[in-house]
Protein backbone atom coordinates (compact mmCIF):
# COMPACT_ATOMS: atom_id res chain seq x y z
CA UNK A 1 0.00 0.00 0.00
CA UNK A 2 1.33 3.46 -0.88
CA UNK A 3 1.93 6.04 1.85
CA UNK A 4 -0.55 8.86 2.25
CA UNK A 5 0.73 12.32 1.37
CA UNK A 6 -0.44 15.12 3.67
CA UNK A 7 0.22 18.49 2.12
CA UNK A 8 0.82 21.57 4.23
CA UNK A 9 3.28 23.02 6.71
CA UNK A 10 4.33 21.33 9.94
CA UNK A 11 6.77 22.23 12.66
CA UNK A 12 10.36 21.22 12.10
CA UNK A 13 10.61 19.65 15.54
CA UNK A 14 8.02 17.04 14.60
CA UNK A 15 10.58 15.49 12.25
CA UNK A 16 14.07 16.73 13.11
CA UNK A 17 14.09 16.94 16.93
CA UNK A 18 15.06 13.42 18.05
CA UNK A 19 16.35 13.52 21.66
CA UNK A 20 16.38 9.71 21.89
CA UNK A 21 18.74 9.30 18.94
CA UNK A 22 22.18 7.82 19.66
CA UNK A 23 24.73 9.03 17.07
CA UNK A 24 26.51 6.42 14.98
CA UNK A 25 30.28 6.24 14.58
CA UNK A 26 29.75 7.01 10.90
CA UNK A 27 27.64 10.12 11.53
CA UNK A 28 29.10 13.56 10.98
CA UNK A 29 28.35 15.52 14.15
CA UNK A 30 28.06 19.30 14.42
CA UNK A 31 27.63 21.70 17.32
CA UNK A 32 25.85 24.98 16.58
CA UNK A 33 25.43 27.92 18.92
CA UNK A 34 21.88 29.12 18.25
CA UNK A 35 20.16 32.36 19.20
CA UNK A 36 16.52 32.24 18.16
CA UNK A 37 13.97 34.98 17.71
CA UNK A 38 11.88 35.81 20.76
CA UNK A 39 9.00 33.39 21.23
CA UNK A 40 10.38 30.57 19.06
CA UNK A 41 10.93 27.39 21.14
CA UNK A 42 14.50 26.14 21.30
CA UNK A 43 13.54 22.72 19.99
CA UNK A 44 11.96 24.33 16.92
CA UNK A 45 15.02 26.52 16.28
CA UNK A 46 17.40 23.56 16.62
CA UNK A 47 15.22 21.35 14.44
CA UNK A 48 15.04 24.07 11.79
CA UNK A 49 18.84 24.14 11.65
CA UNK A 50 18.95 20.35 11.31
CA UNK A 51 16.32 20.43 8.58
CA UNK A 52 17.73 23.21 6.42
CA UNK A 53 21.29 21.84 6.66
CA UNK A 54 20.13 18.40 5.51
CA UNK A 55 16.89 17.31 3.81
CA UNK A 56 14.25 19.80 4.91
CA UNK A 57 12.27 22.56 3.29
CA UNK A 58 9.60 24.89 4.65
CA UNK A 59 6.69 22.83 3.33
CA UNK A 60 5.80 19.16 3.23
CA UNK A 61 6.45 17.93 -0.32
CA UNK A 62 5.12 14.88 -2.13
CA UNK A 63 8.59 13.84 -3.35
CA UNK A 64 9.56 12.91 0.22
CA UNK A 65 7.72 9.68 -0.52
CA UNK A 66 10.28 8.86 -3.23
CA UNK A 67 13.13 8.48 -0.74
CA UNK A 68 13.80 7.36 2.82
CA UNK A 69 13.66 10.62 4.75
CA UNK A 70 14.24 8.84 8.06
CA UNK A 71 17.59 7.59 6.76
CA UNK A 72 18.85 10.82 5.19
CA UNK A 73 17.64 13.55 7.54
CA UNK A 74 19.82 15.45 10.00
CA UNK A 75 18.78 14.91 13.61
CA UNK A 76 19.10 17.32 16.51
CA UNK A 77 19.75 14.91 19.34
CA UNK A 78 20.79 17.25 22.17
CA UNK A 79 20.41 20.82 23.39
CA UNK A 80 22.69 22.37 26.02
CA UNK A 81 22.86 25.69 27.81
CA UNK A 82 25.64 28.11 26.89
CA UNK A 83 27.42 29.09 30.14
CA UNK A 84 26.87 32.76 30.91
CA UNK A 85 24.50 33.33 27.98
CA UNK A 86 20.77 33.08 28.62
CA UNK A 87 19.85 33.95 25.03
CA UNK A 88 21.77 31.20 23.26
CA UNK A 89 22.02 27.43 23.41
CA UNK A 90 24.06 24.66 21.82
CA UNK A 91 22.33 22.36 19.33
CA UNK A 92 24.05 19.05 18.56
CA UNK A 93 23.11 17.60 15.19
CA UNK A 94 23.96 14.24 13.60
CA UNK A 95 24.13 13.86 9.83
CA UNK A 96 24.28 10.52 8.00
CA UNK A 97 27.52 10.20 6.06
CA UNK A 98 25.69 9.57 2.78
CA UNK A 99 24.64 13.24 2.69
CA UNK A 100 28.19 14.26 1.74
CA UNK A 101 30.42 13.71 -1.27
CA UNK A 102 33.50 11.71 -0.36
CA UNK A 103 36.57 13.84 0.29
CA UNK A 104 34.75 17.14 -0.34
CA UNK A 105 35.13 19.75 2.38
CA UNK A 106 33.37 22.10 -0.02
CA UNK A 107 30.25 19.93 -0.01
CA UNK A 108 30.21 19.58 3.79
CA UNK A 109 30.36 23.33 4.31
CA UNK A 110 27.79 24.01 1.60
CA UNK A 111 25.35 21.86 3.56
CA UNK A 112 26.17 22.86 7.12
CA UNK A 113 26.65 26.61 6.67
CA UNK A 114 24.59 27.30 3.58
CA UNK A 115 21.09 28.78 3.52
CA UNK A 116 20.44 28.02 7.18
CA UNK A 117 22.42 31.09 8.28
CA UNK A 118 19.81 33.32 6.68
CA UNK A 119 16.81 31.85 8.51
CA UNK A 120 14.45 34.49 9.89
CA UNK A 121 13.75 32.35 12.96
CA UNK A 122 17.40 32.83 13.95
CA UNK A 123 19.00 36.00 15.21
CA UNK A 124 22.45 34.42 15.29
CA UNK A 125 23.95 31.07 14.36
CA UNK A 126 27.51 29.85 14.79
CA UNK A 127 29.07 26.55 13.82
CA UNK A 128 31.27 25.78 16.82
CA UNK A 129 32.69 22.37 15.96
CA UNK A 130 32.42 19.35 13.66
CA UNK A 131 33.23 15.71 14.42
CA UNK A 132 34.36 14.20 11.13
CA UNK A 133 33.94 10.40 11.17
CA UNK A 134 36.87 8.21 10.19
CA UNK A 135 34.92 6.98 7.19
CA UNK A 136 34.98 10.55 5.81
CA UNK A 137 38.54 11.39 6.87
CA UNK A 138 39.86 8.38 4.97
CA UNK A 139 38.45 9.84 1.74
CA UNK A 140 40.34 13.15 2.16
CA UNK A 141 43.88 13.72 0.93
CA UNK A 142 44.94 15.85 3.88
CA UNK A 143 48.32 17.60 4.10
CA UNK A 144 50.41 16.99 0.98
CA UNK A 145 53.51 16.27 3.08
CA UNK A 146 53.04 16.73 6.82
CA UNK A 147 55.32 17.71 9.67
CA UNK A 148 57.92 14.94 9.50
CA UNK A 149 58.33 15.09 5.74
CA UNK A 150 58.76 18.87 5.91
CA UNK A 151 61.46 18.55 8.56
CA UNK A 152 63.24 15.95 6.43
CA UNK A 153 63.01 18.11 3.31
CA UNK A 154 64.35 21.18 5.09
CA UNK A 155 66.78 19.23 7.32
CA UNK A 156 65.65 21.06 10.45
CA UNK A 157 64.97 19.27 13.72
CA UNK A 158 64.52 19.84 17.45
CA UNK A 159 63.16 23.39 17.39
CA UNK A 160 60.44 25.61 15.94
CA UNK A 161 61.13 26.92 12.46
CA UNK A 162 61.75 30.62 12.05
CA UNK A 163 60.38 32.93 9.39
CA UNK A 164 59.13 36.38 8.49
CA UNK A 165 56.85 38.17 6.07
CA UNK A 166 58.55 40.55 3.67
CA UNK A 167 57.79 44.20 4.48
CA UNK A 168 56.56 46.48 3.13
CA UNK A 169 54.25 43.79 1.81
CA UNK A 170 53.15 45.89 -1.17
CA UNK A 171 55.07 48.28 -3.40
CA UNK A 172 58.53 46.72 -3.73
CA UNK A 173 59.90 45.88 -7.17
CA UNK A 174 60.81 42.26 -7.81
CA UNK A 175 64.54 42.97 -7.48
CA UNK A 176 64.22 44.89 -4.21
CA UNK A 177 61.85 42.24 -2.89
CA UNK A 178 64.48 39.58 -3.58
CA UNK A 179 67.09 41.70 -1.82
CA UNK A 180 64.99 41.77 1.37
CA UNK A 181 64.47 37.99 1.14
CA UNK A 182 68.22 37.47 0.93
CA UNK A 183 68.94 39.74 3.91
CA UNK A 184 66.49 37.81 6.11
CA UNK A 185 67.66 34.35 5.10
CA UNK A 186 71.37 35.10 5.43
CA UNK A 187 70.65 36.56 8.87
CA UNK A 188 69.41 33.22 10.19
CA UNK A 189 65.77 32.65 9.23
CA UNK A 190 64.59 29.36 7.77
CA UNK A 191 61.80 30.89 5.69
CA UNK A 192 60.56 34.16 4.32
CA UNK A 193 57.11 34.62 2.86
CA UNK A 194 54.88 36.55 0.55
CA UNK A 195 52.07 38.27 2.39
CA UNK A 196 48.52 37.25 1.62
CA UNK A 197 47.80 40.07 -0.81
CA UNK A 198 50.93 39.78 -2.94
CA UNK A 199 49.81 38.13 -6.18
CA UNK A 200 50.76 39.80 -9.49
CA UNK A 201 50.34 43.57 -9.30
CA UNK A 202 51.62 46.32 -11.63
CA UNK A 203 54.54 47.15 -9.32
CA UNK A 204 55.67 43.51 -9.20
CA UNK A 205 54.57 40.77 -11.60
CA UNK A 206 54.66 37.28 -10.21
CA UNK A 207 57.25 35.85 -12.63
CA UNK A 208 59.65 38.65 -11.76
CA UNK A 209 59.19 38.10 -8.04
CA UNK A 210 59.61 34.32 -8.32
CA UNK A 211 62.88 34.66 -10.23
CA UNK A 212 64.49 37.17 -7.87
CA UNK A 213 63.32 35.22 -4.81
CA UNK A 214 64.75 31.97 -6.20
CA UNK A 215 68.11 33.69 -6.71
CA UNK A 216 68.01 35.07 -3.15
CA UNK A 217 67.18 31.66 -1.66
CA UNK A 218 69.98 29.96 -3.59
CA UNK A 219 72.56 32.57 -2.58
CA UNK A 220 71.54 32.44 1.10
CA UNK A 221 71.79 28.65 1.09
CA UNK A 222 75.28 28.78 -0.38
CA UNK A 223 76.45 31.33 2.18
CA UNK A 224 74.92 29.71 5.27
CA UNK A 225 75.06 26.01 4.42
CA UNK A 226 71.43 25.70 5.52
CA UNK A 227 68.31 24.78 3.56
CA UNK A 228 66.16 27.87 3.01
CA UNK A 229 62.76 28.59 1.53
CA UNK A 230 60.34 31.34 0.61
CA UNK A 231 56.57 30.92 0.47
CA UNK A 232 55.72 31.91 -3.10
CA UNK A 233 52.05 32.89 -3.15
CA UNK A 234 50.36 31.06 -6.02
CA UNK A 235 46.87 32.35 -5.23
CA UNK A 236 45.47 33.65 -8.51
CA UNK A 237 42.38 34.84 -10.34
CA UNK A 238 41.76 31.43 -11.95
CA UNK A 239 42.80 27.84 -11.16
CA UNK A 240 44.74 27.71 -14.42
CA UNK A 241 46.86 30.70 -13.41
CA UNK A 242 47.36 29.22 -9.93
CA UNK A 243 48.80 26.01 -11.38
CA UNK A 244 50.95 27.97 -13.83
CA UNK A 245 52.57 29.77 -10.90
CA UNK A 246 53.03 26.54 -8.98
CA UNK A 247 54.70 24.89 -11.97
CA UNK A 248 57.08 27.83 -12.37
CA UNK A 249 58.05 27.65 -8.69
CA UNK A 250 58.83 23.97 -9.22
CA UNK A 251 60.93 24.76 -12.31
CA UNK A 252 62.93 27.23 -10.21
CA UNK A 253 63.66 24.49 -7.66
CA UNK A 254 61.75 26.13 -4.82
CA UNK A 255 60.73 23.86 -1.92
CA UNK A 256 57.51 25.59 -0.84
CA UNK A 257 54.58 27.57 -2.24
CA UNK A 258 51.64 29.35 -0.61
CA UNK A 259 47.87 29.63 -0.94
CA UNK A 260 45.19 31.87 0.62
CA UNK A 261 42.75 29.06 1.32
CA UNK A 262 39.66 31.01 2.36
CA UNK A 263 39.68 33.69 -0.32
CA UNK A 264 40.91 31.15 -2.87
CA UNK A 265 38.31 28.59 -1.83
CA UNK A 266 38.41 24.98 -0.67
CA UNK A 267 38.04 23.57 -4.18
CA UNK A 268 41.16 25.41 -5.35
CA UNK A 269 42.99 24.52 -2.15
CA UNK A 270 42.26 20.81 -2.37
CA UNK A 271 43.42 20.76 -5.97
CA UNK A 272 46.64 22.61 -5.16
CA UNK A 273 47.34 20.29 -2.21
CA UNK A 274 47.02 17.28 -4.52
CA UNK A 275 49.40 18.94 -6.98
CA UNK A 276 51.93 19.58 -4.18
CA UNK A 277 51.75 15.95 -3.04
CA UNK A 278 52.33 14.72 -6.59
CA UNK A 279 55.21 17.13 -7.22
CA UNK A 280 56.98 17.03 -3.85
CA UNK A 281 56.34 20.67 -2.93
CA UNK A 282 55.49 21.97 0.55
CA UNK A 283 52.33 24.06 0.94
CA UNK A 284 52.02 27.04 3.28
CA UNK A 285 48.47 28.21 4.00
CA UNK A 286 47.39 31.74 4.89
CA UNK A 287 43.98 32.30 6.50
CA UNK A 288 43.20 35.75 5.06
CA UNK A 289 39.51 36.66 5.58
CA UNK A 290 39.04 34.23 8.49
CA UNK A 291 38.10 36.90 11.04
CA UNK A 292 35.16 38.01 8.89
CA UNK A 293 33.80 34.50 9.42
CA UNK A 294 35.01 33.48 12.87
CA UNK A 295 35.46 36.49 15.16
CA UNK A 296 31.86 37.22 16.18
CA UNK A 297 31.17 35.06 19.26
CA UNK A 298 27.57 34.34 18.23
CA UNK A 299 27.58 34.23 14.45
CA UNK A 300 29.68 32.57 11.77
CA UNK A 301 32.09 29.64 11.91
CA UNK A 302 34.63 29.10 14.68
CA UNK A 303 38.22 28.95 13.50
CA UNK A 304 38.62 25.44 14.94
CA UNK A 305 36.21 24.30 12.21
CA UNK A 306 38.17 26.15 9.53
CA UNK A 307 41.39 24.60 10.88
CA UNK A 308 39.92 21.10 10.78
CA UNK A 309 38.67 21.67 7.25
CA UNK A 310 42.11 22.85 6.17
CA UNK A 311 43.76 19.72 7.53
CA UNK A 312 41.32 17.66 5.47
CA UNK A 313 41.63 19.82 2.35
CA UNK A 314 45.41 19.95 2.54
CA UNK A 315 48.22 22.20 3.75
CA UNK A 316 51.55 21.74 5.52
CA UNK A 317 51.50 25.01 7.50
CA UNK A 318 48.57 27.11 8.72
CA UNK A 319 48.42 30.49 10.45
CA UNK A 320 46.81 30.19 13.90
CA UNK A 321 47.39 33.54 15.58
CA UNK A 322 49.97 34.10 18.29
CA UNK A 323 48.17 34.51 21.67
CA UNK A 324 50.75 37.17 22.61
CA UNK A 325 50.80 39.31 19.46
CA UNK A 326 48.45 41.74 17.75
CA UNK A 327 45.82 39.23 16.58
CA UNK A 328 42.71 37.82 18.28
CA UNK A 329 42.99 34.51 20.16
CA UNK A 330 43.27 33.45 23.80
CA UNK A 331 45.68 30.75 24.91
CA UNK A 332 43.31 27.83 25.57
CA UNK A 333 41.28 28.35 22.41
CA UNK A 334 44.43 28.58 20.31
CA UNK A 335 45.87 25.44 21.87
CA UNK A 336 42.58 23.70 21.10
CA UNK A 337 42.81 24.18 17.37
CA UNK A 338 46.56 23.66 17.32
CA UNK A 339 45.78 20.20 18.73
CA UNK A 340 43.37 19.67 15.83
CA UNK A 341 46.15 20.48 13.37
CA UNK A 342 48.89 18.31 14.84
CA UNK A 343 47.57 15.43 16.92
CA UNK A 344 46.35 12.02 15.74
CA UNK A 345 43.55 11.99 18.34
CA UNK A 346 42.02 14.97 20.14
CA UNK A 347 39.65 14.23 23.05
CA UNK A 348 36.61 16.32 23.87
CA UNK A 349 37.76 19.16 26.11
CA UNK A 350 35.49 22.15 26.61
CA UNK A 351 38.31 24.06 28.35
CA UNK A 352 40.02 24.11 24.94
CA UNK A 353 36.81 24.53 22.96
CA UNK A 354 36.73 20.99 21.57
CA UNK A 355 33.15 19.68 21.69
CA UNK A 356 33.83 16.20 20.33
CA UNK A 357 36.45 13.49 20.31
CA UNK A 358 38.22 13.73 16.96
CA UNK A 359 40.18 10.78 15.59
CA UNK A 360 42.51 11.83 12.78
CA UNK A 361 43.80 8.29 12.26
CA UNK A 362 47.06 8.33 10.29
CA UNK A 363 46.54 11.71 8.61
CA UNK A 364 49.76 13.78 8.75
CA UNK A 365 49.85 16.88 10.93
CA UNK A 366 50.12 20.55 10.02
CA UNK A 367 52.68 23.04 11.34
CA UNK A 368 51.01 25.78 13.40
CA UNK A 369 52.22 29.21 12.27
CA UNK A 370 52.44 32.05 14.81
CA UNK A 371 52.49 35.38 13.02
CA UNK A 372 51.29 38.89 13.75
CA UNK A 373 52.78 41.56 16.00
CA UNK A 374 55.49 39.45 17.65
CA UNK A 375 59.09 40.34 18.56
CA UNK A 376 62.02 38.93 20.52
CA UNK A 377 60.48 39.55 23.94
CA UNK A 378 57.66 37.18 22.94
CA UNK A 379 60.01 34.34 22.04
CA UNK A 380 59.93 32.44 25.36
CA UNK A 381 56.13 32.48 25.47
CA UNK A 382 55.88 31.44 21.82
CA UNK A 383 58.21 28.48 22.30
CA UNK A 384 56.26 27.42 25.41
CA UNK A 385 52.84 27.78 23.77
CA UNK A 386 53.51 26.41 20.29
CA UNK A 387 56.24 23.85 20.91
CA UNK A 388 58.65 22.57 18.30
CA UNK A 389 56.19 21.73 15.51
CA UNK A 390 55.51 25.35 14.68
CA UNK A 391 56.74 28.22 12.56
CA UNK A 392 57.37 31.51 14.37
CA UNK A 393 57.15 34.41 11.94
CA UNK A 394 58.43 37.88 12.81
CA UNK A 395 57.64 40.48 10.14
CA UNK A 396 57.98 43.89 11.75
CA UNK A 397 59.95 42.09 14.47
CA UNK A 398 62.63 41.36 11.87
CA UNK A 399 62.60 44.31 9.47
CA UNK A 400 62.09 46.87 12.23
CA UNK A 401 65.52 46.21 13.73
CA UNK A 402 67.57 49.44 13.72
CA UNK A 403 70.43 47.66 11.95
CA UNK A 404 68.26 46.15 9.21
CA UNK A 405 66.59 42.88 8.32
CA UNK A 406 69.69 40.68 8.56
CA UNK A 407 70.34 41.89 12.10
CA UNK A 408 66.68 41.41 12.98
CA UNK A 409 66.83 37.85 11.68
CA UNK A 410 70.01 37.17 13.66
CA UNK A 411 68.40 38.53 16.83
CA UNK A 412 65.40 36.25 16.41
CA UNK A 413 67.57 33.21 15.70
CA UNK A 414 69.72 33.80 18.78
CA UNK A 415 66.63 34.35 20.94
CA UNK A 416 65.01 31.17 19.62
CA UNK A 417 68.04 29.00 20.19
CA UNK A 418 68.53 30.44 23.68
CA UNK A 419 64.93 29.59 24.59
CA UNK A 420 65.15 26.07 23.18
CA UNK A 421 68.43 25.47 25.02
CA UNK A 422 66.93 26.75 28.29
CA UNK A 423 63.80 24.64 27.84
CA UNK A 424 65.85 21.52 27.14
CA UNK A 425 67.84 22.22 30.30
CA UNK A 426 64.61 22.13 32.31
CA UNK A 427 64.17 25.85 32.91
CA UNK A 428 60.69 27.42 33.02
CA UNK A 429 61.21 29.66 30.05
CA UNK A 430 58.10 31.82 30.49
CA UNK A 431 58.90 32.60 34.11
CA UNK A 432 62.59 33.11 33.41
CA UNK A 433 62.13 34.80 30.04
CA UNK A 434 63.87 38.05 30.91
CA UNK A 435 66.94 36.36 32.35
CA UNK A 436 67.21 33.94 29.42
CA UNK A 437 67.06 36.68 26.80
CA UNK A 438 69.40 39.06 28.62
CA UNK A 439 71.96 36.29 29.09
CA UNK A 440 71.85 35.52 25.36
CA UNK A 441 72.12 39.22 24.49
CA UNK A 442 75.52 39.42 26.19
CA UNK A 443 76.92 37.45 23.25
CA UNK A 444 74.73 38.97 20.51
CA UNK A 445 74.72 42.72 19.89
CA UNK A 446 71.87 42.21 17.40
CA UNK A 447 69.69 40.70 20.12
CA UNK A 448 70.69 43.37 22.64
CA UNK A 449 69.55 46.13 20.27
CA UNK A 450 66.32 44.26 19.49
CA UNK A 451 65.49 43.88 23.18
CA UNK A 452 66.04 47.56 23.74
CA UNK A 453 64.00 48.52 20.66
CA UNK A 454 60.88 46.51 21.55
CA UNK A 455 60.97 46.58 25.33
CA UNK A 456 57.86 48.78 25.58
CA UNK A 457 55.81 47.20 22.76
CA UNK A 458 52.75 45.29 23.98
CA UNK A 459 49.32 44.41 22.56
CA UNK A 460 47.16 44.25 25.68
CA UNK A 461 43.60 44.09 24.38
CA UNK A 462 40.85 41.87 25.70
CA UNK A 463 39.84 38.89 23.57
CA UNK A 464 36.48 39.32 21.82
CA UNK A 465 35.76 35.64 21.22
CA UNK A 466 36.16 33.84 24.54
CA UNK A 467 35.46 30.24 25.52
CA UNK A 468 31.98 29.60 26.92
CA UNK A 469 33.13 28.07 30.20
UniProtKB/Swiss-Prot annotation:
Localisation: Plastid, Organellar chromatophore
Site-annotated residues for Transition state stabilizer: 326
EC identifiers of the protein: 4.1.1.39
Binding residue positions for substrate: 115, 165, 169, 287, 319, 371
GO biological process: reductive pentose-phosphate cycle
Active site per database record: 167, 286
GO CC aspect terms: organellar chromatophore; plastid
Record bears the keyword Transmembrane: no
N6-carboxylysine modified-residue sites: 193
Cofactor note text: Binds 1 Mg(2+) ion per subunit.
Protein's job: RuBisCO catalyzes two reactions: the carboxylation of D-ribulose 1,5-bisphosphate, the primary event in carbon dioxide fixation, as well as the oxidative fragmentation of the pentose substrate. Both reactions occur simultaneously and in competition at the same active site.
Assembly, per entry: Heterohexadecamer of 8 large chains and 8 small chains.
Misc note: The basic functional RuBisCO is composed of a large chain homodimer in a 'head-to-tail' conformation. In form I RuBisCO this homodimer is arranged in a barrel-like tetramer with the small subunits forming a tetrameric 'cap' on each end of the 'barrel'.
Entry protein name: Ribulose bisphosphate carboxylase large chain
Species assigned in the record: Paulinella chromatophora
Gene name in the database record: rbcL
Amino acid sequence: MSKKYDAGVKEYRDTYWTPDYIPLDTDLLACFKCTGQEGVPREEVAAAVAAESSTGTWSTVWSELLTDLEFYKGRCYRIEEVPGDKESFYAFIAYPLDLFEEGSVTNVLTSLVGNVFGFKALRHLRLEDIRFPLAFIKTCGGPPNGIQVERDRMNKYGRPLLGCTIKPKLGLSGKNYGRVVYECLRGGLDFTKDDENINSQPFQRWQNRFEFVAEAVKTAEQETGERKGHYLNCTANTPEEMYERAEFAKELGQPIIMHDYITGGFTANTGLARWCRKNGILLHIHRAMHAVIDRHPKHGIHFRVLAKCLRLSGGDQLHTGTVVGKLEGDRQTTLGYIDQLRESFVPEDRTRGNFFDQDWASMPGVFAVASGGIHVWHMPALVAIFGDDSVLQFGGGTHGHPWGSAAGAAANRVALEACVKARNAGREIEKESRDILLEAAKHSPELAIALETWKEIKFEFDTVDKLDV
